[in-house]
Amino acid sequence: VMRLFARQIESQYREHLPLKEYARRTGVSVTHLNQLCREFHNCSALMVLHERLILEAKRCLQYTQMTISQIADYLGFSDVAYFSRFFKRHTLLSPKAYRGIMNNSDDISETNNLIKLF
C-alpha cells in the first residue's frame, strides 16, 4: 500500500488531489492510509503530500531560474500568494528568502572551494 501511495504521490503531487482520492486509488480508507503514514513516516498522509510539494518547490527555487509565480503554477497552485503562504508555513521562510539563502550558500561554498585550491 505504501509503495503504491508513494508512486501515486510521485506521479500526481502537482494535481492537488484530495486525500480521499489517493486512498481510493490505493484501495484503503483515508483513516487506514493515515495510520500507515504515521507508522512509516511519523506524520499524516497529507503531510507526506505537502513534504513532496515543498521538496519540489525547494528544488525549483534553488536550481532553476523560474520565477516564484512560474513555480507556483508549475506546482499546481492557482494563486502565487497562496503558494508563498504554503511554503512559508512549512519552511518558516518565504520562497524569495529561501532562494536568497540558497544562492548565498552556493557562493560561500564556491568561495571556500577556491580558497582551498590556493
What are these regions (language model features)?
Residues H16, K20-R52, A72-A97:
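Basic/polar phosphate-binding segments, predominantly the helix-turn-helix DNA-binding elements
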